[in-house]
């Protein structure tokens, strides 16, 4: 019997890098409400007392970036100098420019379906049947822990009123013969008000954050718990660390369980294949696993700037496939249009649906409807996390001729 440990981590919406991601995606969403054809590449940096918005945006929309940035910061919970950062009083510096016309000529086409990729690059999508979300268990649990921290923190009459926005979680799982069998270690660090005793903090975090989330079937006497192991975490958020858009790409994806092409997501409109193609191959891999064609599936796709058709598509199922990997690849090519325009149409991506994905993972989330009013005053209902649907599973299984 082979036995090994595997670890993944997540960070809360108050982590400085995630603050930056949420601002970048809030800018993208605000622009898409007014201008679906906008080209957006928005980067954010946050540090003590300041948020810097930079990047390249080509749009007919007008957005009050300063007010929007402040709102995101305050909504996260940085609303007072007492916590070290206040969205109402921090400086906001706007360094936005326009997208290069050299890129535009490679992306824009007379026929929409001929739209070229916004850049070269390689992207990976992954799915596994070890959780109901088709995500690796360690990253799934880590996300739920920091999500629970925020839920408890934001409750009116919270039982843990001393919680602050910045937090991190980490889960180490033991695998036996490739199957998750136990939680070996749990790490959770949460920012807090001064004055809370370590003993009281540890007990409260165990009861209100860990206990409701951790699967009891995987806990055992030997499970190690490290709760605020430094003993003090008062200084956090953008005061403790500089935050940058796109610096949590493993947290955003599969927690290290799958490969990563290197491109970040937040602040990028769907013409950027770093984002849209990564969503598409997650959609592909998840439907392959949901169809029962494999227990695990990783799909790689690559592009050349200005070229519509993918340069390559490859599939690996790590020996868990019920049919050969090359046959799964052929099924993918038959049922999924992985050209940039095809992806945008297939997943209905030109809507303001992105800010919710900027914290707690872009994958493994339940699709949900979001309503907004467009620039014509029309009410529009869009689907966030559309790439998490498994609506292709049935046809894939039928075409694979599995019983």
UniProtKB/Swiss-Prot annotation:
Record-level Gene Ontology MF annotations: ATP binding; magnesium ion binding; methionine adenosyltransferase activity
Flexible loop, as annotated region: 99-109
Chief place of localization: cytoplasm
EC number from the UniProt entry: 2.5.1.6
Compartments where located: Cytoplasm
Family annotation (InterPro entries): ADOMET_SYNTHASE_CS (IPR022631), S-AdoMet_synt_C (IPR022630), S-AdoMet_synt_central (IPR022629), S-AdoMet_synt_N (IPR022628), S-AdoMet_synthetase (IPR002133), S-AdoMet_synthetase_sfam (IPR022636)
One GO CC annotation: cytoplasm
One GO BP annotation of this record: one-carbon metabolic process
Protein name: S-adenosylmethionine synthase
Organism this protein belongs to: Xylella fastidiosa (strain Temecula1 / ATCC 700964)
Gene behind the chain: metK
């Amino acid at each position: 019997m082979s036995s090994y440990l595997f670890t993944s981590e997540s960070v809360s919406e108050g982590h400085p890098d995630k603050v930056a991601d949420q601002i970048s995606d809030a800018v993208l969403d605000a622009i898409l409400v007014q201008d679906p054809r906008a080209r957006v590449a928005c980067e954010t940096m946050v540090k003590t007392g300041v948020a810097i918005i930079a990047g390249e945006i080509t749009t007919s929309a007008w957005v009050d970036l300063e007010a929007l940035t402040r709102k995101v910061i305050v909504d996260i919970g940085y609303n007072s100098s007492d916590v070290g950062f206040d969205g109402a009083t921090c400086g906001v510096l706007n360094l936005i420019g326009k997208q290069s016309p050299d890129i535009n000529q490679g992306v824009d086409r007379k026929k929409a379906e001929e739209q070229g990729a916004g850049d070269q690059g390689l992207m990976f999508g992954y799915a596994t049947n070890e959780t109901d979300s088709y995500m690796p268990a360690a990253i799934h649990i880590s996300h739920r822990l920091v999500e629970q921290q925020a839920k408890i923190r934001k409750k009116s009459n919270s039982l843990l009123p001393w919680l602050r926005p910045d937090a991190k979680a980490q889960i180490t799982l033991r695998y036996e013969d490739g199957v998750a069998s136990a939680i070996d270690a749990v790490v959770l660090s949460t920012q807090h008000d001064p004055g809370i005793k370590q003993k009281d903090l540890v007990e409260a975090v165990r009861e209100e954050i860990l206990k409701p989330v951790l699967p009891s079937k995987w806990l055992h006497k030997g499970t190690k718990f490290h709760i605020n192991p430094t003993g003090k975490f008062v200084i956090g958020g953008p005061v403790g660390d500089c935050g940058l858009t796109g610096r949590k790409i493993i947290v955003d994806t599969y927690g290290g369980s799958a490969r990563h092409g290197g491109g970040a997501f937040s602040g990028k409109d769907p013409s950027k294949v770093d984002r849209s193609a990564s969503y598409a191959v997650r959609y592909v891999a998840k439907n392959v696993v949901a169809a029962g064609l494999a227990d695990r599936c990783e799909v790689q796709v690559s592009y050349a700037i200005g070229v519509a058709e993918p340069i390559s598509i490859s599939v690996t199922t790590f020996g868990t496939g019920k049919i050969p990997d090359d046959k799964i690849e052929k099924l993918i090519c038959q049922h999924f249009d992985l050209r940039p325009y095809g992806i945008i149409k297939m997943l209905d991506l030109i809507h303001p649906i992105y800010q919710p994905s900027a914290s707690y993972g872009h994958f493994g989330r339940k699709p949900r409807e979001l309503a907004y009013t467009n620039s014509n005053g029309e009410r529009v209902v869009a689907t966030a996390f559309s790439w998490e649907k498994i609506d292709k599973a049935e046809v894939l299984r039928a075409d694979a001729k599995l019983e």
